[in-house]
Regions:
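Conserved N-terminal phosphate-binding loop of PLP-dependent enzymes in the Aspartate aminotransferase
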Residues: 1-457
C-alpha cells in the first residue's frame, strides 16, 4: 500500500479544512475562497496540483528550492544517509560525518572570520540560537547591560517569539506582542521612505537612522543589530550602495554586534554565495536555512564569527543550548550535496552573469511606463515589482492590489508572492531564459488584468 492514498481533490481539501492549520493564513478567508490548492509533485521549475494544473514556481517554494524539483542527487544523498544512519544527535561528545563535512564546506564559503557552525532545523531556530549566544557573550565580557536587540521595520527573522519580535511585521507583533528589549528602525526602503534625494543620500540617511536609534537607546545597552542584506519577505528591499558601509562603521563605533540574516539571500540568490559578499558586509554572525538543502529537508545554521566564538569557548563552559535535530545527518548530507551542485554547475556565477541580468532586463522592459507599476527593484534572481496604489481610484487598502494580482498569477499559471502591493520573484537558480520569459509574460498578463479591473490604463 502506498503511504499516501489516492484521493480526489475535493476530499483532500475537505480533510485539509478539517485538520490542518496553515501558517500566515486567515482560515475564514481560506474557506471563503474555496480552500487550498493541493500541490502533488514538482519537476524542474514547475509544480503540479491535484487538478492537473502546471504552474511555474517563481518563488522557489518559499524562497528555498534553489536547485529546482526532482534532483536525483539530493534524493539519493538523503536515501543513502537514511539507510546508513537515519539519526544521531550531536549531544554528549558525539557527532556524525555529514554534520562535520557540511560545517567545513560552509566555513569555506562564508565571509572571512566566520568559522563555527551550530545547526538547527529552521531560520527561526538559528535566530533564537544567535540571540542566546549574543546575550551570553556580553555577560561573559562583563557587559550584562548590553541586552537590547535592534532590527528594522519590514524585517523578517522568523516566527518564534524572538524571531517575530525582531521582525518588523506589525501583524506578527499584534498576535503575541514584542519581547522587551527589542527595538526597530526604518529600513533602506526608498520607494516608501525616500524623499527628493539621490540614492546615495537616502542610503546615508537610512544608515544614520540606525546610529540615531542606538544613541537614543544608549550604546552601552545595545547588544546587536539584526539585518538581512536584502529584505526578502519584507518586499525585496534592496539598500543603496551607501547604506551598508555606513551601517558597519556605526556598529563598530558603538561596539554593536552585527547579525546578517542570510536565510533568503544565501547560496547564490544575489549572484554571490552570500548577500554579505554582494554588499561587502563583514558580520559577527550569519544565519542560513532554506536553500542550504534546496528546501528538500529542514536545516538551518548559525555561523559564528571568531570574536564571539573565542569568548564562548574560553569563558563559557558548557553550552546550555541545543535541539534534538541539531546536525541531523540526513539534512546535512543533502546540504553537502546541494553545496557541491551549486559549485559544480556554476549556478552562483550563472545567476550573477546571465540569468540575473536577463531577468532584470525582462522585468524593466515589460513594465517600463506601466500605469500600475511604481518600481522594479532587485538583485541577482531576487526581484520585486511594486504596484502603485496611488494610480487606483479610490485608493485601495494596502495589500489589496497585491492580493488581487496574485490571484490572477495563479490563474495564469505562475506562482509569485505578494508582499503588501509588491509582487516578488525568486525562481529556482536553475531557471532557463525561456522559463524567465514565461514567468515575466504571465506576471505582466496578471498585472495588466488587475489594471483593467480597476480602470487604470
Amino acid at each position: 500500500m502506498p503511504p499516501i492514498p489516492e484521493r480526489a481533490s475535493a476530499e483532500w481539501r475537505r480533510f485539509d479544512a478539517d485538520h490542518l492549520i496553515h501558517p500566515f493564513t486567515d482560515p475564514l478567508a481560506l474557506a471563503a475562497g474555496g480552500g487550498t490548492r493541493v500541490v502533488t509533485r514538482g519537476e524542474g521549475v514547475y509544480v503540479f496540483d491535484s487538478d492537473g494544473n502546471r504552474l511555474l514556481d517563481g518563488l522557489a517554494g518559499l524562497w528555498c528550492v534553489a536547485l529546482g524539483y526532482g534532483r536525483s542527487e539530493l534524493i539519493g544523498a538523503a536515501e543513502r544517509q537514511l539507510r546508513a544512519l537515519p539519526y544521531y544527535s550531536s549531544f554528549f561528545h558525539t557527532t556524525t560525518t555529514p554534520a562535520i563535512e557540511l560545517a567545513r564546506l560552509l566555513c569555506e564559503r562564508t565571509p572571512p572570520g566566520l568559522d563555527r557552525v551550530f545547526f538547527g532545523c529552521s531560520g527561526s531556530e538559528s535566530i533564537d540560537t544567535v540571540v542566546r549566544m549574543i546575550w551570553n557573550y556580553w555577560d561573559l565580557e562583563d557587559q550584562p547591560r548590553k541586552r537590547i536587540l535592534l532590527s528594522r521595520e519590514f524585517a523578517y527573522h522568523g516566527s518564534t517569539v524572538a524571531g517575530a519580535s525582531l521582525g518588523g511585521m506589525s501583524n506578527m507583533h499584534a498576535m503575541s506582542g514584542v519581547l522587551a528589549g527589542v527595538a526597530h528602525v526604518m529600513p533602506p526602503y526608498a520607494y516608501r521612505y525616500g524623499r527628493d534625494e539621490t540614492p546615495e543620500a537616502f542610503g546615508r540617511r537610512a544608515a544614520d537612522a540606525v546610529e540615531e536609534r542606538i544613541l537614543a537607546l544608549d550604546p552601552e545597552r545595545v547588544a546587536a543589530f539584526f539585518a538581512e542584506p536584502v529584505q526578502g519577505a519584507g518586499g525585496v528591499i534592496v539598500p543603496p550602495e551607501s547604506y551598508w558601509p555606513r551601517v558597519q562603521e556605526i556598529c563598530r563605533r558603538y561596539d554593536v554586534l552585527l547579525v546578517a540574516d542570510e536565510v533568503i539571500c544565501g547560496f547564490g540568490r544575489t549572484g554571490q554565495w552570500f548577500g554579505c559578499d554582494a554588499f561587502e558586509i563583514r558580520p559577527d554572525f550569519i544565519t542560513v536555512a532554506k536553500a542550504i538543502t534546496s528546501g528538500y529537508l529542514p536545516l538551518s545554521a548559525a555561523v559564528v564569527g571568531e570574536r564571539v566564538a573565542r569568548t564562548l569557548e574560553r569563558k563559557g563552559g558548557r553550552l546550555a543550548h541545543g535541539y534534538t535535530y541539531s546536525g541531523h545527518p540526513a539534512p546535512c548530507a543533502v546540504g553537502v550535496a546541494t553545496l557541491r551542485i551549486l559549485a559544480a554547475e556554476g549556478l552562483v556565477e550563472r545567476t550573477r552573469e546571465e540569468t540575473g541580468p536577463y531577468l532584470e532586463r525582462c522585468l524593466r522592459e515589460a513594465f517600463a511606463g506601466h500605469p500600475l507599476v511604481g518600481e522594479v527593484r532587485g538583485v541577482g534572481l531576487l526581484w520585486a515589482v511594486e504596484l502603485d496604489r496611488d494610480a487606483a481610484s479610490p485608493l485601495p487598502p494596502e495589500g489589496e492590489l497585491g492580493l488581487r494580482c496574485l490571484a490572477h498569477c495563479f490563474d495564469n499559471g505562475v506562482v509569485l508572492r505578494a508582499v503588501r502591493d509588491a509582487l516578488c520573484f525568486c525562481p529556482p537558480l536553475v531557471i532557463r531564459r525561456s522559463e524567465i520569459d514565461e514567468m515575466v509574460e504571465k506576471a505582466k498578463k496578471s498585472i495588466d488584468r488587475t489594471a483593467a479591473e480597476i480602470g487604470v490604463a
